[in-house]
Regions:
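N-terminal structured subdomain of primase-like DNA metabolism proteins
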Residues: 1-88
Length: 88
């Protein structure tokens, strides 16, 4: 199984968002970190996120890549390290 599949199976978007400091409310909404957002406009689903304000969307790897300005591969490696997933 490749690293991308491993990450997507092991880490939900919500888990990653919470781990990286985003405050998730009861409706799985957060203030979008990708634009100036005062009220939660980003919806966190199990396997993807979507911002109703700026249109940002993607999976857990895309979220980490955008949060930390990383390539998809480097974001996957960061997620693996942060969540204790063996990339081999």
């Amino acid at each position: 199984m490749d690293l991308f599949t491993q990450i997507k199976m092991a880490v939900s978007v919500k888990e990653a968002a919470e781990y990286y400091g985003l405050e998730v409310n009861r409706g799985n909404m957060v203030c979008c970190p990708f634009h100036n957002d005062r009220t939660p406009s980003m919806k966190l689903n199990e396997d993807y996120f979507y911002c109703f304000g700026c249109g940002a969307t993607g999976d857990v790897i895309d979220l980490a890549a955008r949060l930390f300005n990383l390539s998809s591969y480097d974001a996957a490696k960061k997620l693996a390290y942060d969540f204790g997933i063996d990339p081999d």
